[in-house]
Amino acid sequence: MLEFKKFTDFPRGMMYEILADAYSYDERNKAVWDDNWHESDDFFYDNPEIAEKYGLVTCLDGYPIGFVTWDPRQRPEYVEIGHNAIREAYKRQGYGHMQLAEAISRIKKYEGLKRIIVCTNSKLIAPKNYESVGFVLYDRKANNTDSAYNGEYLYYEISLE
């Protein structure tokens, strides 16, 4: 059974573990993003009041297979999707779509919100997932960072006006 739980239902390190697994298809990801993954995990577990409001963990039969976070600090202009990951073994089975749809449903409840935004890379599978829940591409930029192998930056939005 698929259900959505709080980060605080799981021990510290779970977010990092899922990110490392979700991006394990290319060893360069860990080299580039490992510090960010640890920092994100630490932030959410050091701030449980934030973790409970601005993210969810997707569980299949009680096992955490993914998660998504969002940053509401720019409301009412926009809320930005942060990390959005599904363990490698559970990709391409619809779980990422369901996870993102649940997050969008929760975010849309913010009164007066104008947009939901996200940035991803062109060579990931994520663009198709974002488009499947209603995000529309509004900009793209060159990626001249250490993660350039993942393709250019794609900027998506859902307009709520």
What are these regions (language model features)?
Residues 57, 63-72, 78-80, 85:
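Conserved beta-strand in the GNAT
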Residues 131-140:
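Conserved acetyl-CoA-binding loop of GNAT-fold acetyltransferases
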Residues 1-13, 17, 159-161:
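Conserved N-terminal entry element of GNAT/NAT acetyltransferase domains
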Residues 3, 9, 20-45:
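Conserved GNAT-fold acetyl-CoA-binding loop/helix
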Residues 45-52:
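Short loop/turn motifs at secondary-structure junctions and domain boundaries
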Residues 117-127, 143-149:
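Conserved beta-strand-loop-alpha-helix junction that forms the acyl-donor binding cleft
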Residues 86, 92-105, 131-132:
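Conserved acetyl-CoA-binding loop-helix of GNAT-fold acetyltransferases
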Residues 107-120:
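Conserved GNAT acetyl-CoA-binding A-motif
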